[in-house]
């Protein structure tokens, strides 16, 4: 074999200049892919961000670069680190694991793509790559127990909501498909020119192919802008809302104030907000406090176990139309010989306790409705595959979170009562708790069950002043478009906001400052296409990816068998 020839594939090994070009392309990918998640109104960069990565892969393959998986993995690690480094502020180990594990899955997709090129030719491997990537995102959003869908490509447009009004039909994965289509289209045109095929093309191809690509780039944004202007932003009915941002440092929550003192301070701020804005609290009003505002509540025995419930009930006695929705840490105790579930922990008195991250709504009657968060953060709140990991966790002394979530979503009802305590009105409200607002189809479940308004209660203080809380806020804009609902967002340290069905942030608070919003939120009863039919894009791409993968596997098996026989 001649020097400089790769012994495995017979192709010339890459020279140093080409390796440098690959490094530049890797860096360019990281920059272009990261900016939409870090800088407002840069979502359009995602339509070109994958081209450097595809070029890097092409150069590496053509020049026999060894360990291409390491190039892919490095690119994805850097992208994940640049956009989600802030997770380390809450948990260093969890943050590093999220970055490395997410990047590993992304590089595994590219590894499968490279394997498919052994039997697929032309554009088919690239089509398979796009389908496989979106299938993975769909799996992350719907089925995976270890799930971190923060960097779904369609989320790139979260701060460019006017360009993706069509998410009401496709959801965020429609954005992922558009991004892949535009990137592959540009990459194809570049390869067409670089290989000299452009000289062999006829006039029709020379004109039609670039025009088709321009149409692919512009058709959806043009439609979206027209749809954005045409959308009716005046709802038929509204609900008065009060959003309170207490700005309590969760790392020092009980060092300065007891829970009773925090409750009193919250209620005082509610009164100040009402007085400042001149609102009449006898009308139906929804007041919100953030995620895990209080704790120590035993489900089924809230009257005896919660000072918060007693203080809130006393406060609401002269406010017949006010409903208070707040986050709470709640518990279920069971006295039995065996654990009621893998997530239960044993207490000293022999009972078993199960933890919940909950949202509770109540009015002056003291009656409550509770929803337990069902999309839980892996490690911190939820133990994946508990039949296996519970044994490991027990050996480690219980370091993994074991919150128990609901099997399906339920609604909280904002009620209005007359002077005799009779219910005269009821408004169904969906409440996504923190991380749940990242999941499109999860949020559509509230609307399918009849929610006329969506709320998000969250903490968002764990990450510090980083891009994390801004990204989290922006994803609520996408959920508003997908569901066609107003979203009222209450965050402990910011940013709290009111968002309309176009994804516009109508009002918002500042970060790390006590604040309140007194406003009106629209009530809607129509269902978008995405709510009615779900994530069709994700399901179709998953089906196509499975079919192509099976075809590749069969063809690879047959080819290998023929080689052995030869």
Spans of model-derived segments:
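Membrane-embedded alpha-helical bundles of multi-pass enzymes
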Residues: 2-229, 465, 479-480, 506, ...
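Short, conserved active-site loops that position catalytic residues or coordinate cofactors/metal ions
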Residues: 37-54, 79, 245-246, 281-300, ...
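Generic structural signal for well-ordered alpha-helices
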Residues: 109, 113, 270-274, 409, ...
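CN hydrolase (nitrilase-like) catalytic-core segments centered on the catalytic cysteine
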Residues: 130, 286, 294, 302-333, ...
